[in-house]
Regions:
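Alpha-helical transmembrane segments
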Residues: 2-103, 134-172, 213, 228-243, ...
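Juxtamembrane interfacial secondary-structure elements that flank transmembrane helices
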Residues: 98-112, 203-210
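Flexible hinge motifs at transmembrane-helix junctions and intramembrane kinks/re-entrant loops
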Residues: 180-183
Length: 450
């Protein structure tokens, strides 16, 4: 899997000598460019960029929530409380990342930016695995919100705790992967284990509505998939957790795609809440909002350090955490198939990666573009990733420009689904209550025209 690190072997820094060939010798000195102090501060967050990005992505969501739809006060109040906690989590994450960077450097968890090799920036130790800060703040926010919002006898409490258990489990496994650097085949097993609490707690329906053009051929209007639907959700959790990890390789891409998808999920949820009169249907989408707002806020804080040029790397800890969180909200919010549409860029990247991931072609450790230090441009290689495919199709680009292009593509794919949802939601306003019993139906099937 493509990852932006080339960590050096752990160096023993104790006062004891290293024994080699029965002779005691001192550890060789590091080259001058590697003698970086662990106390050296990282670059400050890119606050201006994050502020502009936040306005672009979050303003439509709050406009729909507060002005466009007439949403009940009892439903808006917990969403705004959650938003306030998320805002506090943003500033807390911004403050904690520089502190955590010093500790991970002391433990030799760092990497070199391969896409800057041959330049002074390519010799700087970049702290790795800073996704652990995002995950820790996220867990604190969601637990505090649980105390403020859910009663002890709430029907949603079991699923909420199961969601937090799966997310926490996946964060732990991701950090283990960062430390041990496990083979990619093992990576497929990690989310399958972490998803078990989620699947065991799922109490939603497993039926889908058959599109009318297919009803004469199938003979059914509603099909109950039963246990097969849970298998689908299990594979969805595995895919979402790994797809962000393999759609990577340039500064800001991992955190950036999470921010774009999370924003699309929020807009989708508020449109479904506003277009429905069914309280249970509204609560399912509000449940999703409660988890996505903290994810978006903490990811924006991480992106302020991870945007080009990155002063920290997110690590597998973050990609696993973010992927599992979005899988959880899609499954328990009952729009798991719609979620897959938001991941269309990741689906394309996975399809391009299949020959290498499954051993049909040679798969190098880092499937990154080729960097030219003279021009500062990236050239696409023959590796099967969307990053390289985009460069081969549209020519060489700088790393910053390439990331912006890829996130724009991600946003366009997600917004197309959002606008489709908006038009259908307006058409079907007031009919959601009769559609709700098929809670697990795909978004593109439930909105089939009558």
């Amino acid at each position: 899997m493509a990852r932006k690190r080339a960590s050096e072997p752990t160096t023993i820094t104790t006062k004891e000598a290293i024994v080699t060939s029965d002779k005691e010798t001192k550890p060789p000195p590091l080259p001058p460019h590697r003698q970086t102090s662990n106390d050296q501060p990282i670059a400050p967050p890119k606050k201006g960029f994050i502020f502009k990005l936040s306005l672009l992505l979050i303003a439509p969501y709050f406009y729909l929530l507060l002005f466009h739809y007439q949403i009940q006060h009892d439903l808006i109040k917990p969403i705004l409380i959650n938003a306030g906690l998320s805002l506090a989590g943003f500033f807390l994450t911004v403050k904690l990342i520089p502190v955590a960077s010093k500790y991970v450097l002391k433990r030799n968890l760092f990497g070199y930016d391969i896409n800057k090799k041959g330049t002074p920036q390519g010799t700087v130790k970049v702290p790795e695995s800073l996704g652990i800060v995002v995950a820790a703040v996220f867990m604190v926010l969601t637990i505090v919100f649980q105390f403020l919002n859910f009663a002890p006898d709430s029907n949603w409490l079991v699923e909420y705790n199961a969601a937090l258990a799966s997310i926490c489990f996946m964060t732990l496994l991701g950090f283990i992967d960062d430390v041990l650097d496990v083979p990619w085949r093992v990576k497929l097993l990690l989310p399958s284990i972490a998803a078990l609490p989620l699947l065991m707690a799922y109490a939603g329906h497993t039926t889908i509505i058959i599109p009318k053009p297919l009803v004469p051929y199938i003979g059914l209007k509603v099909l109950d998939l039963g246990f097969i639907y849970k298998i689908y959700m299990w594979f969805l959790a595995i895919f979402c957790t790994n797809c962000i990890n393999i759609h990577a390789g340039i500064n800001g891409l991992e955190a950036g795609q999470t921010v774009v998808i999370a924003s699309a999920i929020l807009i989708h949820n508020v449109m479904q809440i506003g277009a429905s009169a069914d309280p249970e249907y509204q609560q399912a989408h509000a449940f999703s909002v409660y988890l996505v707002q903290p994810l978006l806020a903490t990811s924006l804080a991480l992106l302020s350090y991870n945007w080009y040029p990155s002063s920290v790397f997110v690590g597998d800890t973050y990609t696993y955490f973010a992927g599992m969180t979005m899988a959880v909200v899609g499954i328990l919010g009952h729009f798991s198939e719609t979620l897959l549409i938001f991941f269309l860029a990741q689906v394309l990247n996975f399809l391009l990666s299949v020959p290498q991931l499954f051993g049909f072609r040679h798969c190098p450790r880092h499937r990154l573009p080729r960097f030219d230090p003279q021009t500062g441009l990236l050239t696409g290689t023959n590796d099967g990733t969307l990053v390289n495919f985009y460069l081969r199709m549209f020519g060489r680009k700088t790393e910053n420009s390439l990331c912006m292009h890829l996130l724009l593509v991600q946003g366009l794919l997600a917004s197309s689904r959002v606008w489709t949802s908006l038009s259908h939601a307006s058409h079907n306003f007031g009919t959601r209550e009769r559609r709700w019993p098929q809670a697990g139906v795909p978004g593109f099937l439930i909105m089939a025209p009558d």
